[in-house]
Amino acid sequence: GGVLFVDEAYSLARGGEKDFGKESIDTLVKNMEEHKDNLILILAGYKQEMCWFLETNPGLRSRFPIQVDFPDYTIAELQEIAELMLSQRQYCFNEEARLEMESLFLEILHKSREYSGNARLVRNIIEKSIRQQAMRLVEQDQVSRNDLLTITRNDILLASQN
């Protein structure tokens, strides 16, 4: 018994006949039946791919009667996540950087509504910005404590290009 969480579950069905994806799906279905009283199986992934995945095996959709759709984060929520991630690492944005992040989120979400509004996007930008900040500070002769803690607009611009 227990709980099994499978993220990006649709990837099990992508490989075709020569990999073990189909066998994995068949095993999951079999175990769901054999342990229906003490096994919770949670499948996660992007909505469109999950719909496709549930059609790849007869009866798979009916075995998952409860489906929960989590909407993408809003620009304000992405901004809040970015601020939180930075503060957890003991960094902060200056005001220009904060505005640039908001502009960047708007641009990314405008280009591709699908898959953009998630925390992974924010984490990647934050991590790249911190690396850009470090590369910028290495070039300076004098570095203040504030310099060490502050992410600038230019750090974000360079991070978003890589």
Where are these regions (language model features)?
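Canonical AAA+ ATPase core
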Residues: Y10-E17, I25-P71, A76, Q88-R89, ...
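C-terminal functional regions that serve as terminal interaction/effector modules
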Residues: G1-G2, F70
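C-terminal engagement/docking regions of AAA+ P-loop ATPases
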Residues: Q132-N162
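Conserved C-terminal "switch" segment of AAA+ ATPases
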Residues: E49-T56, R61-S62, F70-Y115, A134-D141
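Hydrophobic positions in the central parallel beta-sheet of the AAA+
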Residues: L4-F5, L41
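Conserved Walker B
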Residues: G2, E8-Y10
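C-terminal helical "lid" of AAA+/P-loop NTPase domains
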Residues: G117-E139
